[in-house]
Amino acid sequence: MATREHELRPEQERLGEDREEYEDGEEEEEEEEEEEGWDDWESDGDDAGGGGGGLLCLFCSARFDSESSLFSHCASEHRFDFYRVVKETGMDFYGCIKLINFVRSKVAENKCWSCGQVFSSNSELCGHLHALEIPQLEGKVPWGDDVYLKPFLEDDSLLHSLSVFDDDDEDDCGMPMEKGGCSAGNGSLAETCESNLKSIINDGSDVIDRFERTCTIESTDGECSGSLAQEPSDKQLKIARASAAARGINSVDESYFGSYSSFGIHREMLGDKVRTEAYRDALLGNPSLMNGATVLDVGCGTGILSLFAAKAGASRVIAVDGSAKMVSVATEVTKSNGFLYDENMEMQQKRDTQVITVVHTKAEELNHKIQVPSNKFDVLVSEWMGYCLLYESMLSSVLYARDHFLKPGGAILPDTATIFGAGFGKGGTSLPFWENVYGFDMSCIGKEVTGNSARFPVVDILASEDIVTETAVLNSFDLATMKENEMDFTSSFELRLSESGVSPSGVTWCYGIILWFDTGFTNRFCKEKPVNLSTSPFSTPTHWSQTIFTFEEPIAMAKEESAVVSSASVGTDECPAVMIRSRISIVRASEHRSIDISIETTGISSDGRKRSWPVQIFNL
């Protein structure tokens, strides 16, 4: 993201360098100013400032020399009492960072941070700001999401100036230290600390570890001795950790978007007829929805959904993708097919089909890249689904786009999603293969492979005949109304042996649980032609396959009418279970874009006895 004109570069903010002198590269003056600037860093803006400092107000263009003067201005002019919010919510340092970034993001949208009302200009917003109302959403503050750890403004000097959690104003060496009075080798301690802090902000968490483990500094002249790790305040380390957390998310995002830069995965997705034709039919088959509509395509990839939307008669299509490579490809594809919007072309020269603009950005940052239409979008379309529906966690970006860019009552496609589960038999494992390899018994290998599968989920296509139980619904999502926290859920369900799963002996072994999903383009929005996209093992296979979770040990099952009452352990050949009661939790993992799955399993016999197996934890 380009540096905004009204923002200062971080070196200028911290070291107090004059902008022109910095750009002219006058090294001698820089060295002097660097030493002087360290005192400014230590005092952290104790001097009250006017409008010409480096700290930008959260609501208007006023600037200040200190945090206290800035927040005093916010309280008196904008009715935003930062310190009161901190006190009443009991926020820690990271909460303060999130709050500042949250407020800045809302102000950028001309939206009241407290009540959410939207205005047409910043002046109208500032005229509206009212007495403190701390918004709560289901008992949580709306800035609690870790996405707000990432600075909304590039090089936001206010984040480096927060002193609300500072314990004291003295240096951490335990004694007054004059400028240049303590050195480390050939460089000053100030320079070393400043350099390390810059490295933390630039490099991430690995540098934080080095920073905290830094060895003791020994002065050459005996004036001062102390740990370098003690010199910068806890506040600076917290800023570094917050920055590193945001950078960690960015790093995963870059890897994620980079993985979609390969044409192989797009070839696979485009070649998935179930997937592509479902979107095609929903977009082309519903003219009352699409004709003249403004459309936002989140995660556009090659641009295929945008092309369908344009062909369906959309008046404007904004295609968004986080991969620079795919944005370039989608732009070229769109241009080659005569759908690319060219703002430099005269209106009389444009064809009605030239409606697509491709933008390189994440959905959460779209309004920083382009001017979002004032009346927002009529239709939001995205192919966001991952393995087990929620892997990759792209759904959060779609929900963000829905809440910020879709007009009230606008259509989201697809608008429903449902996760299903069922038990599978021996054919769903690799055991049959290893039991007869060119006439040789290698079942010992099969058992080891199956044991490994009990620790890791497997994405594969199962044949419908390998499903031995009835199907259960784990969870359903209404994408038009759901909240982001609903992506984390726990579901309890029961599995009974299906008619097709009954074996000749009467006992069938269930080796685990398989999950799949359907997404619906329902008649809520697709009135002429509703469409259902299914990844079920009973339907045509898709590139999503199914997600397989193998039990630590298989469970014997039988129909209730044929089950034998026995004192043996439930789930064995002697006492098969007539029902498996399972509880599955799926939550977003600490690793960005991953999910954690826990499975609790209980077998119930025909006489009501129960046997529970240890909880299994999987990461996808």
Curated annotation (Swiss-Prot):
The EC number on file is: 2.1.1.319
Chain ranges of zinc fingers (C2H2-type): 55-78, 110-137
Which residue ranges does the record annotate as region Disordered?
1-45
List the InterPro entries.
ANM3-like_C2H2_Zf, Arg_MeTrfase, Methyltransf_25, PRMT_dom, SAM-dependent_MTases_sf, Znf_C2H2_sf, Znf_C2H2_type
* One GO term (biological process): methylation
- Supply the enzyme class, top level: transferase
Classification via Pfam families: ANM3_C2H2_Zf (PF21137), Methyltransf_25 (PF13649), PRMT_C (PF22528)
Q: Where in the cell is it found?
A: Cytoplasm, Cytosol
- Mind telling me which PROSITE patterns this protein's record contains? SAM_MT_PRMT, ZINC_FINGER_C2H2_1
**Catalytic site:** E383, E392
Question: Is Repeat among this UniProt entry's keywords?
Answer: yes
Which family, according to UniProt? Belongs to the class I-like SAM-binding methyltransferase superfamily. Protein arginine N-methyltransferase family.
Designated name of the protein: Probable protein arginine N-methyltransferase 3
Whose protein is this, by species? Oryza sativa subsp. indica
